């Protein structure tokens, strides 16, 4: 039995011909694209109980079945699903690079192979765990025919209309890109995506653990997820996932694929072979479409390859001897478009019009239209705009009620939208205006009468009066750049006794301090004279807006120069539930929010299960000198929707410290969901020490005063183990008379200590400071050096030196923030000297004096020597400089091995993000280079597209490549052919790892092999 049953085009979900196999299935880009999910991040669209493709009763590779599907498709559930190896696959991050999962998938492949053989009747007498084998109706292959009697048309989206919801986790730019992908499908097919209102079945864009995942076709009976996980938010990938939603399978699983491509099985990653199984001819219908190499639903040549340069799918050569390209993720192919139009039975005549203006006409205009013609035009402009349709010619057969030949215009996105008019004859209709941003125009002819036909023009107009309780407003041409010289005015009115709520999904308008050029203006009322709420521009989303009445006035203006992506906003009717007599049913406190409200409790109480009443809670007032604080339910997972506030108070002149023993909260970069906040003071207006989440244990935190506020919040989704923390109070001796210290007093637990400013050392009495010796050796990757006695004038007759060393492979940089040394043309008196090496005999980088801040100085290697000299006469303020490191540079290789590290803080911290470093290793002429990786840990990706180390056998990147590396485990030794090697280290802005350590040397090596065997 084939792994999935369906048609070409990655194979269409063939309900069109009445053939449905397996029901709902999911395709995960953790398998399709090699993208994986972090595991700690969750989509926040949790109020929607959607069908999650990451959870299923049975998994066959990237195919998921639940109990309903097993019944619908007459599959006997004879395997114990609580024990079978399919069960856990849906709860991983995609499985790539996971050795245990690869082994499990290897076993899975064997089981799938057995299922296929059972389906062909080859093991009719075998059983699984003493049960009847897994069977499919029509088990004997020669009896296998399309099951027209069980046609499942509900898997096609009715009318080609797909309602959608975008989860709250996504940024404005991501939302815009999702809409661009949907408009791309709309432009070329008759499929329509609409924002969901009250439709029962719809899709939800989410961020789920299965990476890029989607069901194939319409699931029905409620919402279904389309997961756009980590690294999946690319236009082509979203178009691909929407292809699955519409009804497409992967092209390379067509029954006839062996006539067009060759599967090179020895190059496939172990355990991933099942991704290359094909469907059976009796189980699918290709709808007459040819194999499409260019399909956006086709795997690339190296998908699931053991190496990025090894092919797993090799396309056959065409008539010109050229192998077609496969695996593009740029746009729909002609085959994709043709297949979708067949699947959804799009009329051959008509199109989707998305420009701000355009025209349409009957076929053959003005030379007459054919009989029995059916055309549909869908006009779709930016939400917040209206469509004005003007007929310029009308010459159709006239009949009673326009029964035969007619044009219908509807105010909306499909054939059931409100009718604006039905027209025939030769009388021009009045100008028609839509109430929203979509219009449906349908033309039918059934007579043999010959007339010119019709012609019409349309134009999108922005602004106008909007009288409804909810909707969307976007800048003209959103999500593309808005047009120049536009002025749009919207007057929004909702039901009486309500307010207008306005929230922004994305916002990008030309920036100016006073918003003088392009801007959005919002006023609290019905006109430009109403009170101003705000004039907005720039890239920060405005705060949510709530009018004081049931009206809101908005104006968008663009000038003739810079154009940006614009804005997208939702408006809705809003009421203040807390102003009602029962305060929303809240027992203690009612907090009104835009579009809703929530109950809250006083400190020491928490909301009960009904979310309205209050009960004794976590938190409270703590006056002990020490104690322990834990999250509710410790050591089990903390419950959702908790808000705990601890107020810790100590005696006067004491300070409170908190040390976490264990810490694990739901993680997010901005700690938006579950978090702990620690304040110096008892209110949320005090000094905030930090907001913490994730699994990294915070440092010890000490209050500024004798009280501290600790607040824990959890949302309604993911729960973790929580935290356990100890607090303790200590007397702050420094708070009185500086602890007797001459310079600085530092409080410590149970005691205190004195410190001296730069250039001084602590006296034996541990309180006073005396002038320090002026020789320092510095080994830290960054820090501060100053002239003696800084910030006061430096003393006379002083000589100070600094020997600065950094990590091998990194150059030292010295940058001055202040500089004032006695001026002399040749710096003969007081001066600062900087040397490119470890001693004053090294090449000099500069001899400095005067009042001008010098340019930064960069050494060629990882050592720098700095010397300051003052004479007996004039003294000045001196200098202050920071030393840091820069990666890259030219390094000389010798016969003695040398080291090179990925980053200056190797061993202490992971490498930073957004780095591009190049090292040029050069040996003596006639010698070669040997490179040996001592440590290697770089973010893993199949094509090494995110973080990587790339080597070239020469002076620059045009030389022969020695390899691009990522992942864990050091590569084998590398030998150059020439006397130089260029090393390029690149990192993106997300996952950071330990990095690498290379040991290199110059050798005499006659062999020309690059890699040691």
From Swiss-Prot:
One of its GO terms (cellular component) is extracellular region. Glycans are attached at residues 169, 359, 390, 626. One of its GO terms (molecular function) is zinc ion binding. This is Tolloid-like protein 1. The lineage of its organism: Eukaryota, Metazoa, Chordata, Craniata, Vertebrata. Its EC number is 3.4.24.-. InterPro entries: BMP_1/tolloid-like, CUB_dom, EGF-like_Ca-bd_dom, EGF-like_dom, EGF-type_Asp/Asn_hydroxyl_site, EGF_Ca-bd_CS, MetalloPept_cat_dom_sf, Peptidase_M12A. It comes from Homo sapiens. Residues 349-461, 462-574, 618-730, 774-886, 887-1003 form the CUB domain.
């Amino acid at each position: 039995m084939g792994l999935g049953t369906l048609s070409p085009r990655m194979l269409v979900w063939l309900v069109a011909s009445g053939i449905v196999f397996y029901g709902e299935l999911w395709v995960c880009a953790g398998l399709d694209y090699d993208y994986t999910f972090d595991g700690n991040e969750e989509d926040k669209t949790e109020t929607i109980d959607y069908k999650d493709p990451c959870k299923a009763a049975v998994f066959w590779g990237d195919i998921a079945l639940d109990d309903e599907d097993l019944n619908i498709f007459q599959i006997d559930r004879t395997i114990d699903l609580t024990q079978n190896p399919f069960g856990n696959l849906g709860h991983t991050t995609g499985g790539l690079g996971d050795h245990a999962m690869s082994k499990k998938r290897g076993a899975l492949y064997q089981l799938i192979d057995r299922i296929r053989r059972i389906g062909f009747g080859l093991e009719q007498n075998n059983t699984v765990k003493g049960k009847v084998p897994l069977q499919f109706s029509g088990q004997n292959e020669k009896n296998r025919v399309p099951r027209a009697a069980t046609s499942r048309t509900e898997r096609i989206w009715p009318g080609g209309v797909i309602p959608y919801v975008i989860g709250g986790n996504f940024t404005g730019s991501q939302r815009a890109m999702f809409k661009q992908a949907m408009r791309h499908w709309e432009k070329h097919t008759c499929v329509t995506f609409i924002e969901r209102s009250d439709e029962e079945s719809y899709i939800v864009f989410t961020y789920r653990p299965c990476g890029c995942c989607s069901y194939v076709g319409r699931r029905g009976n409620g919402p279904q997820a389309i997961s756009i996980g980590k690294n999946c938010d690319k236009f082509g990938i979203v178009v691909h996932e929407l292809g699955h939603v519409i009804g497409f399978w992967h092209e390379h699983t067509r029954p006839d694929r062996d006539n067009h491509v060759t599967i090179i099985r020895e190059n496939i990653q172990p355990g991933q072979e099942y991704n290359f199984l094909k469907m059976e001819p009796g189980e699918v219908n290709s709808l007459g479409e040819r194999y499409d190499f260019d399909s956006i639903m086709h795997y690339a040549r190296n998908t699931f390859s053991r190496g990025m340069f090894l092919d797993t799918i090799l396309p056959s050569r065409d008539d010109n001897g050229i192998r077609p390209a496969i695996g593009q993720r740029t746009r729909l192919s002609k085959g994709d478009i043709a297949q979708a139009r067949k699947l959804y039975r799009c009329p051959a005549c008509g199109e989707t019009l998305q420009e701000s203006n355009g025209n349409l006409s009957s076929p053959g205009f003005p030379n007459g239209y054919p009989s029995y013609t059916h055309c549909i035009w869908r006009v779709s402009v930016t939400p917040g705009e209206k469509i004005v349709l003007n007929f310029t010619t009308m010459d159709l057969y006239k009949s009673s009620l326009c029964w035969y030949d007619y044009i219908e215009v509807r105010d909306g996105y499909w054939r059931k939208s409100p009718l604006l008019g039905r027209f025939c004859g030769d009388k021009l209709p009045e100008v028609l205006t839509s109430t929203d941003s979509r219009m449906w125009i349908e033309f039918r002819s059934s007579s043999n009468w010959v007339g010119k036909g019709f012609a019409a023009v349309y134009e999108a107009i922005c602004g106008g009066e909007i009288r409804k309780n909810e909707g969307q407003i976007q800048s003209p041409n959103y999500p593309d750049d808005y047009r120049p010289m536009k002025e749009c005015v919207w007057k929004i009115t909702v039901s009486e006794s309500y307010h207008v709520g306005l929230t922004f999904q994305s916002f990008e308008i030309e920036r100016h301090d006073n918003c003088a050029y392009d801007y959005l203006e919002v006023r609290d009322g019905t006109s430009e004279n109403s009170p101003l709420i705000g004039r907005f521009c720039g890239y920060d989303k405005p705060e949510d807006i709530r009018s004081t009445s049931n009206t809101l006035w908005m104006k968008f203006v663009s000038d003739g120069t810079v154009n940006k992506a614009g804005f997208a906003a939702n408006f809705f009717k809003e009421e203040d539930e807390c102003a009602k007599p029962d305060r929303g049913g809240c027992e203690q406190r009612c907090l009104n929010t835009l579009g809703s409200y929530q109950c809250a409790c006083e400190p020491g109480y928490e909301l009960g299960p009904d979310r309205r009443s209050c009960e004794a809670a976590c938190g409270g007032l703590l006056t002990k000198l020490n104690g322990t604080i834990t999250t509710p339910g410790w050591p089990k997972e903390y419950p959702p929707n908790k808000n705990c506030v601890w107020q810790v108070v100590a005696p006067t002149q004491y300070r409170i410290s908190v040390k976490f023993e264990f810490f694990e909260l739901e993680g997010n970069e901005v700690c938006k969901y579950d978090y702990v906040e620690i304040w110096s003071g008892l209110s949320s207006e005090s000094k905030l020490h930090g907001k913490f989440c994730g699994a990294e244990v915070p440092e010890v935190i000490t209050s500024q005063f004798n009280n501290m506020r600790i607040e824990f919040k959890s949302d309604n989704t993911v729960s973790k183990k929580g935290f356990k923390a100890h607090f303790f109070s200590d007397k702050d001796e420094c708070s009185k008379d500086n602890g007797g210290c001459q310079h600085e007093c530092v409080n410590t637990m149970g005691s205190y200590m004195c410190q001296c400013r730069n250039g001084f050392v602590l006296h034996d009495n541990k309180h006073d400071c005396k002038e320090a010796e002026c020789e320092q050796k510095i080994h830290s990757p960054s820090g501060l050096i100053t002239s003696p006695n800084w910030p006061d004038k430096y003393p006379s007759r002083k000589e100070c030196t600094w020997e600065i060393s950094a990590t091998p492979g990194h150059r030292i940089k010295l940058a001055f923030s202040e500089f004032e040394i006695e001026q002399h043309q040749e710096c003969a008196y007081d001066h600062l000297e900087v040397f490119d090496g470890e001693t004053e005999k090294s090449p000099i980088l500069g001899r400095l004096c005067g009042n001008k801040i010098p340019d930064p100085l960069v050494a060629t290697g990882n050592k720098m020597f700095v010397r300051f000299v003052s004479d007996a006469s004039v003294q000045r303020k001196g200098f202050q400089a920071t030393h840091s490191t820069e990666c890259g540079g030219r390094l000389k290789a010798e016969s003695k091995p040398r080291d090179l590290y990925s980053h200056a803080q190797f061993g202490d911290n992971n490498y930073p993000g957004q780095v591009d470093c190049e090292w040029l290793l050069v040996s003596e002429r006639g010698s070669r280079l040997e490179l040996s990786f001592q440590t290697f840990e770089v973010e893993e990706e199949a094509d090494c597209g995110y973080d990587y180390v790339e080597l070239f056998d020469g002076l620059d990147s045009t030389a022969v490549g020695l390899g691009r590396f990522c992942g864990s485990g050091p590569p084998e030794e590398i030998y150059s052919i020439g006397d130089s090697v260029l090393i390029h280290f690149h990192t993106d802005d997300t996952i950071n790892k330990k990095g690498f350590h290379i040991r290199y040397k110059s050798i005499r090596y006659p062999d020309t092999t690059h890699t040691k065997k």
